[in-house]
């Protein structure tokens, strides 16, 4: 049986050097590469962003600032792999995207110009009757450099809520009033969380994270309620830690960071990091919690 029909665990291996870039899965920036003067390597799980049929991966290299020159050594390598939750020792590579500043045409060094078929029941070997289809890359250099790839990989994961949610506006182009309307709506939800945490009432807010917690349990084959319990313990640890203090703020300190697919939006502070912040007392640093929202039928839902 194909591991895709069991309990697949998808991950991205990201290796980069002398470059700044976003890594994108299905219209969501799942990782930011900031290796502008050195190398980095990381592997991240992506089940909670994956679709059960068709998925899109991308590398978006930051555009150059005026007067800035890109190092000829700039590279990004992105590899999608899968393993079974029941047998994690065997990992299989499915698709790859690569960026090399030293070469002009990413299409030329990113594999075939025709779809490639892989067989998930035969160690993802290339076969004409394969059930996995890796499409050629698409390159867009209108703003920075974007290299994306479509992958048809039928699997047993459910359709996550954000795939079917309302399209969000382009927050970089809408009016100030429309932007403020959505920001204020998310701030009201944030404020409920902040007020509860300020008095240590963690149980009062866990239901706001119901979709996030439930879908995380499903994505990684956890027991029902495990992610909820983990979030509760993390909040309690922060609330009871005498070395950190909840940062309470009015709405002017916050903003919106939309995901490129316009299905999710992050509610962030002015430093572009997670909205819920516990600052260390007497020293720099903080403990942060992300708030990532979607909208369905007019209702804002914490999705991730």
What positions do the PLM features span?
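A generic "functional-site adjacency" signal
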Residues: 48-49, 187
């Amino acid at each position: 049986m194909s591991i895709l029909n069991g309990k697949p665990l998808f991950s991205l291996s990201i290796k980069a050097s002398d470059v700044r870039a976003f890594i994108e899965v299905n219209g969501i920036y799942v990782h930011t590469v900031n290796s502008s003067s050195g190398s980095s390597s990381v592997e991240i799980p992506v089940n909670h962003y994956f679709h059960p049929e068709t998925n899109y991966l991308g590398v978006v290299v930051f555009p150059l600032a005026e007067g800035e020159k890109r190092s000829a050594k700039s590279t990004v390598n992105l590899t999608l792999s899968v393993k079974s939750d029941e047998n994690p020792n065997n990992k299989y590579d499915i698709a790859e995207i690569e960026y090399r500043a030293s070469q002009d045409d990413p299409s030329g060094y990113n594999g075939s110009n025709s779809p490639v078929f892989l067989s998930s029941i035969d160690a993802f070997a290339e076969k004409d009757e394969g059930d996995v289809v890796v499409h050629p890359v698409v390159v867009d250099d209108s703003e920075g450099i974007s290299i994306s790839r479509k992958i048809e990989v039928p699997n047993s994961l459910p359709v996550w809520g954000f795939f079917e949610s309302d399209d969000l506006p382009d927050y970089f182009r809408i009016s100030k009033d429309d932007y403020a309307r959505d920001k204020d709506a998310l701030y009201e939800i944030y404020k409920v969380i902040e007020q509860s945490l300020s008095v240590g009432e963690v149980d009062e807010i866990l239901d706001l994270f119901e979709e996030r917690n439930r879908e995380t349990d499903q994505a990684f084959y956890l027991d029902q309620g495990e992610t909820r319990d983990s979030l509760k313990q993390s909040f309690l640890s922060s609330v009871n830690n005498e070395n950190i203090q909840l940062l309470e703020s009015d709405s002017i300190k916050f903003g919106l960071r939309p995901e490129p697919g316009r299905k999710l939006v992050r509610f962030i502070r002015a430093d572009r990091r997670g909205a819920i912040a516990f600052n260390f007392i007497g020293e720099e640093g903080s403990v942060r919690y992300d708030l990532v929202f979607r909208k369905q039928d007019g209702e804002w839902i914490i999705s991730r």
